[in-house]
C-alpha cells in the first residue's frame, strides 16, 4: 500500500533546486576576451595614427639636414704665398689705383711726353684727363711761307739735320672755299717728343718770311 505525501509549503528561496548549469564563468570569459580584443584594436589604431607623425618628423629632420651644411662657416681668404695678393684680383685694383692716382690717370714722365704715335685707346673724361692724354701726343711744327722757300728748306734740313725731326710733309694749301686763310703754303714737321722739337728749333735756322707754330696730333 503506497501513500503519497504532498507538502503544503511553497518552495522558498533557501530551498535547494535541481541541478543547474553554471553560466556565469562563461559570460565572464567572453566579456574578458572582448575587452582584450578591443584593447588590442585601440593599440593598433594608436600605433597607426602615430606612424605618420613619426614619418613626418623623420622627413623634417632629413629636410633640415642640408640646411645645416649651408650654415657652416666659410674658410677665410688666404693670400697667395708667392705674390702676397688675396684671391679675387685685389692686388691688381690696388696697382691700377696707384698708377692712375687720386684724380685720374697719372701724368707722363718727361721721357714719355709726345711718345704716342697712334690715336688714344679710350676717350679721356674730364679736362685734366684730356690734358694728360694730350701730353702723349706727338708734337709737330706748322711752317707757313712761300712754296719755293719751304721746298728748299725741306731739302737742306733733310740732308744736314735728319736726326732733329721724325718726318716732313710736302708743301700744301687749304683747298676749302670757306677758308679765309689761303695766302701762302704750309708744311708740317713731326717729332718723336718735345725734346726733339726743342733741339730742332735750337739747331735748324728758320728762313726769313716763314712763321712757325707749335702743335700736336693724336697720331701720325
UniProtKB/Swiss-Prot annotation:
Start-end of Basic residues biased regions: 14-31
Source organism superkingdom: Viruses
GO cellular component, as recorded: host cell nucleus
Region (Disordered): 1-123
Compartment(s) of residence: Host nucleus
Pfam (any one): PPV_E2_C
Cysteine disulfide links: none
Primary localization class, coarse: host cell
GO biological processes: regulation of DNA replication
Keywords assigned by UniProt, alphabetized: Host nucleus
Recorded GO MF terms: DNA binding; DNA-binding transcription factor activity
InterPro entries: E2/EBNA1_C_sf, Nucleotide-bd_a/b_plait_sf, Papillomavirus_E2_C
Function: Plays a role in limiting the replication of viral DNA in keratinocytes. Recruits the host NCoR/SMRT complex to viral replication foci to mediate repression of both viral replication and transcription.
UniProt record similarity statement: Belongs to the papillomaviridae E8^E2C protein family.
Protein name according to UniProt: Protein E8^E2C
Amino acid at each position: 500500500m503506497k501513500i503519497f505525501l504532498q507538502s503544503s509549503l511553497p518552495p522558498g528561496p533557501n530551498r535547494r533546486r535541481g541541478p543547474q548549469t553554471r553560466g556565469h564563468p562563461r559570460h565572464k570569459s567572453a566579456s574578458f576576451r572582448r575587452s582584450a580584443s578591443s584593447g588590442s584594436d585601440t593599440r593598433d589604431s594608436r600605433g597607426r595614427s602615430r606612424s605618420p607623425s613619426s614619418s613626418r618628423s623623420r622627413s623634417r629632420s632629413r629636410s633640415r639636414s642640408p640646411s645645416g651644411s649651408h650654415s657652416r662657416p666659410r674658410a677665410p681668404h688666404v693670400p697667395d704665398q708667392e705674390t702676397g695678393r688675396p684671391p679675387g684680383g685685389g692686388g691688381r685694383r690696388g696697382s691700377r689705383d696707384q698708377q692712375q692716382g687720386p684724380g685720374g690717370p697719372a701724368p707722363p714722365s718727361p721721357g714719355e711726353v709726345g711718345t704716342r704715335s697712334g690715336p688714344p685707346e679710350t676717350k679721356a673724361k674730364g679736362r685734366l684727363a684730356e690734358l694728360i692724354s694730350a701730353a702723349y701726343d706727338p708734337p709737330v711744327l706748322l711752317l707757313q711761307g712761300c712754296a719755293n722757300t719751304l721746298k728748299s728748306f725741306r731739302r737742306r734740313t733733310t740732308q744736314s739735320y735728319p736726326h732733329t725731326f721724325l718726318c716732313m710733309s710736302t708743301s700744301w694749301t687749304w683747298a676749302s672755299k670757306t677758308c679765309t686763310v689761303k695766302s701762302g703754303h704750309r708744311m708740317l714737321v713731326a717729332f718723336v717728343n718735345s725734346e726733339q722739337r726743342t733741339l730742332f728749333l735750337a739747331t735748324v735756322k728758320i728762313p726769313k718770311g716763314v712763321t712757325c707754330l707749335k702743335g700736336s696730333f693724336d697720331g701720325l
